[in-house]
Amino acid sequence: KAIDAVRDATLFTYSGLASNDATVFDFAAKAAAAGKDPKEEARKEGFKPDLRKRGHVRSAFDGRYRFTRYFSPLDHNSPQTLDQLFKWNDVELYDLAKDPGETANLALDRKKNEKLLLAMNRKLEAAIKKEIGKDDGRELPDVAGVTWGLDRIDL
């Protein structure tokens, strides 16, 4: 059976605040190397991860193409146009039939691949709607009002 016989695309998502900003690990390692408690140092220095970084992932694979959006947890989005897609996301698009090693990102040529980018974005949005429902960050921990502003880090 073809991979798309059951659904138009498979969905992969990742939302992890701890790994959204790699400077968290650098900060913790330096504090530990200095013999200090990373949590206490973070509190004293007011260190917080930069949640504007695009570390969250939504990805779809339709049997040939893998389409991935990387976005900030502060900017959950459902882009409908090419401009919106690239405004709120870092984008990857690979043709796994021709490029199984995912080395040639087709999203780098927006103009040439506009129709394919938008088609794969629609498949991704459909998979999100079907499998997640409302994709607004509610899977993230314990933040009232869905603002995602952190006042501490858990190391």
Give names to the regions the model predicted.
Residues Y14-L108:
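C-terminal, low-complexity/hydrophilic appendages and adjacent surface loops
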Residues A2-F12:
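His-Asp-centered acyl/peptidyl-transfer active-site segments
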Residues V6, V57, Y65-T68, G137, ...:
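Short, intrinsically disordered low-complexity segments
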Residues L17-A18, D26-F27, K48-D50, F86-W88, ...:
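Long, internal low-complexity/basic segments
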